[in-house]
C-alpha cells in the first residue's frame, strides 16, 4: 500500500532565497526540458549533446536520465503500470526542484503515457515545461536498438516493452518535435541547436 501523500502534521518551510534571486546569480531561468520518445529514439544522445552545448555557453544544466534514476531514486520500482506512474511522478518532483534552483533540468525518459507527462507539466509552471518529442518511427528505433532491448522484447524475454506490447502515447501539444529525416535520426548537434534556439527565443538563457 502506497503512503505517498499520506503524511500529516507537516508544514511548508519557505526558503530565505527565492527563485528570482537564484536565477539572477546564474544569469539564466530555471526550466525543465522533458525529452520523451521510444527506446532508441535518441533521447539520451540529445540530452548529452544539449547539456554540453549549454555548458559551452556558460549555462548550468543537469540531466535526469531514466535508466540512471532506476539505479538510485527509483530502484524500488519495476515496470508495472502503477510503478511507471510513480517513476514519472518522482522524476517530475525532482525536476521541479532543479528548475526552482534556477537550473535547466534535462529529463530524458520514455515516459510513454500522456497523462503522466501532463501531470508533470501541471506540477511545474507551464511556461517552464518544455516537452521535446523524439518523433522517430518504431522501425528506425528498432533498427538502432543500442541496448538490444527490442531484440529481447521480440523474443518474449521482456514483457510490457513500450512500442512492442505496451503503447506509447505521442504528445498532442509538445513545444518541440524532432523528426527523422530520410530514415535517419538528425545529428546530436543539430537537435541540440534546435532546442537551444527555442530556449533563447523564450528567454531562458538570460535573466532579464
UniProtKB/Swiss-Prot annotation:
Q: Where is this site: Participates in a stacking interaction with the adenine ring of adenylyl-sulfate?
A: 79
Q: What Gene Ontology molecular-function terms does this entry list?
A: adenylylsulfate kinase activity; ATP binding
Q: Which InterPro entries match?
A: APS_kinase, P-loop_NTPase
Reactions catalysed: adenosine 5'-phosphosulfate + ATP = 3'-phosphoadenylyl sulfate + ADP + H(+)
Q: Which UniProt keywords apply?
A: Amino-acid biosynthesis, ATP-binding, Cysteine biosynthesis, Cytoplasm, Kinase, Nucleotide-binding, Transferase
Q: What is the E.C. number?
A: 2.7.1.25
Indicate what this protein is called per its UniProt record.
Answer: Adenylyl-sulfate kinase 3
Q: Gene symbol?
A: APK3
Amino acid at each position: 500500500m502506497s503512503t505517498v501523500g499520506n503524511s500529516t502534521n507537516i508544514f511548508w518551510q519557505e526558503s530565505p532565497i527565492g527563485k528570482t534571486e537564484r536565477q539572477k546569480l546564474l544569469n539564466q531561468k530555471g526550466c525543465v526540458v522533458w525529452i520523451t520518445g521510444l527506446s532508441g529514439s535518441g533521447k539520451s544522445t540529445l540530452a548529452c549533446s544539449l547539456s554540453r552545448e549549454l555548458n559551452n555557453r556558460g549555462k548550468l544544466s543537469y540531466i535526469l536520465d531514466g535508466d540512471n534514476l532506476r539505479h538510485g531514486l527509483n530502484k524500488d520500482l519495476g515496470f508495472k503500470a502503477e510503478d511507471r506512474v510513480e517513476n514519472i511522478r518522482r522524476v517530475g518532483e525532482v525536476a521541479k526542484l532543479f528548475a526552482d534552483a534556477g537550473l535547466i533540468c534535462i529529463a530524458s525518459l520514455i515516459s510513454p503515457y500522456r497523462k503522466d507527462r501532463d501531470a508533470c507539466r501541471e506540477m511545474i509552471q507551464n511556461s517552464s515545461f518544455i516537452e521535446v518529442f523524439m518523433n522517430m518511427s518504431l522501425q528506425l528505433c528498432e533498427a538502432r536498438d543500442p541496448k538490444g532491448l527490442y531484440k529481447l522484447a521480440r523474443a518474449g524475454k521482456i514483457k510490457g516493452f513500450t512500442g512492442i506490447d505496451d503503447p506509447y502515447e505521442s504528445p498532442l501539444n509538445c513545444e518541440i518535435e524532432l523528426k527523422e529525416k530520410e530514415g535517419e535520426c538528425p545529428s546530436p548537434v543539430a537537435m541540440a541547436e534546435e532546442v537551444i534556439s527555442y530556449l533563447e527565443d523564450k528567454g531562458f538563457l538570460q535573466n532579464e
